[in-house]
Design a protein with these regions (language model features):
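Phosphate-binding chemistry for phosphorylated carbohydrates and sugar-nucleotides
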Residues: 1-208
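Catalytic-core signal marking the mid-to-C-terminal active-site face
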Residues: 196-239
Length: 239
């Protein structure tokens, strides 16, 4: 609340999906974000023609706002069922892999985790950024195949508390699932506790731990024939 009382601004795009009413209640009514901070807040059967996928392509309205003039201090979006999230600063995008690493590095800033966490896990396709953080904090770090069930097994056996994947999913053992609003609130807590911007937090993280570079290819709107050829080529090269 103090963050917003001091003039902090944010833009949260609910993408006409399920998180809209929750976001309005949490961010604007409880925390005091300025009215209008939450956009596309009404859940619609067709998502208002939007594709509720929180990435740089489908959350274009949010991205344009955050990279434009007079951008809010913080930007975020969740997907159709609220489990995935995207984090942005002014003219700055945080990759899901870096977000997981930064969340893990700052767990002690959050009251619920100040007494410690069990460990962390990432999908095999997610960068090693979180692994370096885990090593510094003397926490176990697991790499698992793609599929949330593998994270759940680790949470159930109390081996991890946080987990995430490069496809914008981040979660915690508090519900054993991906939780997009939880991730957004975690970032707001980091900002409030440190007094730093999204970019400053991320740049300082890179300076301390190094930066991981990786590449993801998304093929949109291609024919089945082309998709089959891509799969065959991937198999040929061991992908």
């Amino acid at each position: 609340k103090k963050l917003f009382a001091n003039g902090f601004t944010m833009r949260y795009d609910a993408m006409n999906a399920v998180t809209g009413p929750y976001a309005l209640r949490i961010f604007e009514e409880i925390l005091g974000a300025p009215k209008g901070s939450v956009v596309n807040s009404k859940p619609l059967p067709d998502f208002g023609g939007l594709h509720p996928d929180p990435n740089l392509v489908y959350a274009k309205e949010l991205v344009d706002t955050m990279y434009g003039d007079n951008a809010p201090d913080f930007g975020a979006a969740n997907d159709g069922d609220g489990d995935r999230n995207m984090i942005l600063g002014q003219k700055f995008f945080v990759t899901p892999s870096d977000s997981l690493a930064i969340i893990t590095d700052n767990y002690q800033l959050i009251p619920a985790y100040k007494n410690g966490i069990y460990g962390v896990a990432k999908s095999a396709a997610t960068s090693t950024a979180v692994c370096r953080v885990a090593e510094a904090h003397k926490l176990p770090c697991y790499a698992v195949p793609t599929g949330w069930k593998y994270f759940v097994n680790l949470m159930d056996s109390k081996r991890i508390t946080f987990c995430g994947e490069e496809s914008f999913g981040t979660g915690s053992s508090h519900i054993r699932e991906k939780d997009g609003i939880w991730a957004v609130l975690f970032w707001l807590n980091i900002i409030a506790a440190t007094g730093k911007s999204v970019e400053e937090i991320t740049m300082e993280h890179w300076k301390k731990y190094g930066r991981s570079y990786y590449m993801r290819f998304d093929f949109e709107g291609i024919s089945g024939e082309v998709a089959d050829k891509l799969r065959e080529a991937g198999a040929e090269y061991g992908a």
